[in-house]
Amino acid sequence: MSAAKPTTLYDKIWNDHLVHEAEDGTCLLYIDRHLVHEVTSPQAFEGLRTAGRKVHAPEKTLAVVDHNVPTTDRSKPNPDPESAEQIAALAENARDFGVTYYNEFDKRQGVVHVIGPEQGFTLPGTTIVCGDSHTSTHGAFGALAHGIGTSEVEHVLATQTLIQKKAKNMRVTVDGDLPDGVTAKDIILAIIGEIGTAGGTGYVLEYAGDAIRALSMEGRMTVCNMSIEGGARAGLIAPDEKAYAYLKGRPMAPTGAHWDAAMRYWDTLRSDEGAHFDHELRLDAAALPPIVTWGTSPEDVISVTGKVPNPADIADEAKRLSKERALAYMGLTPGTKITDIKIDRMFIGSCTNGRIEDLRAAAKVAEGKTVNANVNAIIVPGSGLVKEQAEAEGLDKIFVKAGFEWREPGCSMCLAMNPDKLAPEERCASTSNRNFEGRQGFKGRTHLVSPAMAAAAAIAGHFVDIRDWR
């Protein structure tokens, strides 16, 4: 009898959840966990209501408000009627369909991809979906997680299944030790800079190597979070003792004999020696610098010690024109030193970098310093529990004393769907995940960086090399 064929982590999770495969490769996949927020769910719930259907597995569904909630005084009415309507609709739908729901006054409320792991709702080996593109965050725990559209949200609510076609496998190996000042955010920006925003199209990425294993769980979440910016369907990291330690004791995590049984399964969740990957990429962590994006795509990356590139050097006409447009939108001139670029705003938060370790890194930079008089800087914790922990550690006092605004949890300035927006041509150092035109506000200019880099820029008034920070 021949030995079983070596399989990847993605293959294992996929096969464990495959309900049916048609001749054309279309598959029906069982979904273990469904995260829901106020923006992509109203039509889905209304579809159920119209058809007279129930939520198939309410205990496997978790709802939270995050995109539209104000991060300032929540005792006042939401200033945007459409946002207020979506928030009210989610509360009503959660109540009517028996779904667990964290409203804006619940300390467990926060960005959906922060609260999932925080509550132990995210578990290794599970399939997780949400009507949000950054669902790949949960892959840090060895979960197969990706975003879905509103019609698919309704399908999962009704059936706890999803129609899919299997993606290909790509492994990204990052070996070596990260230099001081270089973070998980720089790793994923470097990867996107290497493969481009379409390089991962049709793939699920598995992140491996010494540098990935050395990351904390929060760092791993940052890496997996931006898999979609590289075009990938999802990102995965094999679970290990760090993942188990993070999850143990969380409110929704298994306990007792159930935990022990889960651990036995989780220990099988790694790619076998000799498993086939359709594409491989390797990076040397030791060679990575702190990174700043300069354009209007996450692939527009450069070292903080670099200069704004000249599109004239690009041979491909379509790409050259695209980069010329990006520079015009960003109001930048080729050859400008990155450290000479001044900022107007700073945002630390989002499902990419709104966790406690991110806030600690920023506070370390901010302590004893003062935000530049020309910069408005806001700190938005990823959840009420992150906010509570930060305040217990006194981080809020460090930020406020330095001149940063300390806010309530939510998606905030990551996207222009709430009161936290850039004015036209305002330039922002942001720890979020997208620097598209208008992402943070009409004609707003976004530069993606790590939390420490963002905090340092807010204090200096321009980008600085965090490795030189004193």
Curated annotation (Swiss-Prot):
Cofactors demanded by this protein: [4Fe-4S] cluster
Presence of the UniProt keyword Amino-acid biosynthesis in the record: yes
Binding site for [4Fe-4S] cluster: 351, 411, 414
Keyword Cell wall biogenesis/degradation (UniProt): no
Enzyme type, top EC level: lyase
Pathway of action: Amino-acid biosynthesis; L-leucine biosynthesis; L-leucine from 3-methyl-2-oxobutanoate: step 2/4
Coiled-coil residue windows: none
Matching Gene3D superfamilies: Aconitase, domain 3
EC numbers on record: 4.2.1.33
Catalysed reactions, as listed in the record: (2R,3S)-3-isopropylmalate = (2S)-2-isopropylmalate
InterPro entries xrefs: 3-IsopropMal_deHydase_lsu, Acnase/IPM_dHydase_lsu_aba_1/3, Acoase/IPM_deHydtase_lsu_aba, Aconitase_4Fe-4S_BS, Aconitase_4Fe-4S_dom, IPM_dehydratase_rel_enz, IPMI_cat
Family as reported in the entry's similarity comment: Belongs to the aconitase/IPM isomerase family. LeuC type 1 subfamily.
Subunit structure: Heterodimer of LeuC and LeuD.
Function statement: Catalyzes the isomerization between 2-isopropylmalate and 3-isopropylmalate, via the formation of 2-isopropylmaleate.
Name of the molecule in the record: 3-isopropylmalate dehydratase large subunit
